[in-house]
């Protein structure tokens, strides 16, 4: 049985992720590039994201909608990654994607299982963007700044005639843009809020392996945690902002605790200095000097506490 030759209309697109390596802040890191491919024009703007979760998917879409100046009428997804989870033959959408889709008003659907011909266009675009823009491995310091430039670079790749229509792809892309739905008056805040209890050290743990410090003073308290694509925002139980951390990804455990958050406790427990993170974070000369000062201050019962308050 042959494949069905699909016909795409202006303003319709396909979405998919691919894997790329970048030198992120000096370290070679495996990331994901999200491509929103417009088969009518053969143009596919992209965004670089650290993962394929709902926050990354929706943030990439929001960034591209704002760059496009509108919202695609229909988006076809290769699979449920970042949108929901497969449950037997059905896909259960995440609450974040449901709210995001309702806010922007686009239609969505998924490729049929084992129907590779349905996603050929976007898979080809994912590969083309990777080969042309991520080889050799690019250096990235700020994902936000890199993503501001990335869609324009993808558009430059399409500055040629369409392989089947013989017309300018950028001209056809103008037709895609004219068919877009208008942007809503306000952008969608891409964040998943959840409540977590801080551990005895004042940390909250995401995905069972990424620890984020709220501070020792919040130990055992219920916290409100906001998960964004690039950040984790922590609020207290009343909704007051406590701290924001860069979001960690990967299978290895991470800990984003700030050693300076222990200074307050060291005032009350100076004997813990030897095993504190504050001590580990200091350069050798300063560490040795403070070791000597703490030893001298221990002659007085309150001396160490006075010393750490002066450091803080």
Task: Label every model-predicted segment.
Residues 234-312:
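Protein C-terminal end segments and domain termini
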């Amino acid at each position: 049985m042959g494949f069905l030759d699909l016909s795409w209309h202006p303003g319709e697109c396909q979405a998919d992720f691919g894997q790329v390596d970048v030198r992120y802040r000096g370290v070679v890191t495996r990331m994901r590039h999200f491509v929103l491919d417009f088969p009518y024009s053969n143009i596919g703007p992209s965004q670089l994201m650290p993962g394929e979760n709902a926050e990354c998917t929706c943030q990439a879409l929001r960034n591209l909608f704002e760059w496009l100046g509108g919202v695609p009428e229909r988006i076809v997804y290769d699979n449920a990654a970042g949108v929901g989870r497969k449950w037997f033959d059905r896909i259960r959408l995440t609450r974040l994607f449901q709210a995001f889709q309702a806010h922007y008003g686009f239609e969505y659907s998924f490729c049929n299982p084992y129907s590779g011909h349905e996603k050929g266009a976007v898979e080809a675009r994912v590969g083309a963007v990777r080969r042309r823009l991520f080889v050799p491995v690019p250096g990235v310091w700020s994902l936000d700044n890199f993503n501001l430039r990335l869609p324009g670079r993808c558009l430059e790749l399409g500055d040629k005639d369409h392989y089947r229509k013989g017309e300018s792809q950028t001209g056809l892309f103008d037709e895609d843009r004219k068919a877009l739905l208008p942007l809503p008056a306000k952008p969608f805040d891409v964040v998943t809020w959840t409540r977590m209890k801080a551990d005895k050290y004042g940390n909250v743990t995401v995905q069972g392996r990424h620890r984020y410090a709220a501070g020792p003073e919040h130990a055992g308290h219920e916290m409100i945690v906001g998960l964004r694509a690039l950040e984790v925002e922590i609020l207290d139980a009343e909704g007051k902002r406590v701290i924001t951390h860069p979001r960690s990804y990967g299978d290895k455990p991470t800990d984003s605790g700030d050693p300076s958050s222990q200074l307050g406790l060291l005032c009350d427990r100076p004997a813990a200095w030897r095993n504190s993170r504050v001590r580990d974070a200091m350069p050798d000369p300063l560490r040795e000097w403070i070791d000597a000062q703490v030893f001298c201050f221990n002659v007085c019962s309150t001396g160490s506490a006075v010393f750490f308050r002066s450091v803080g």
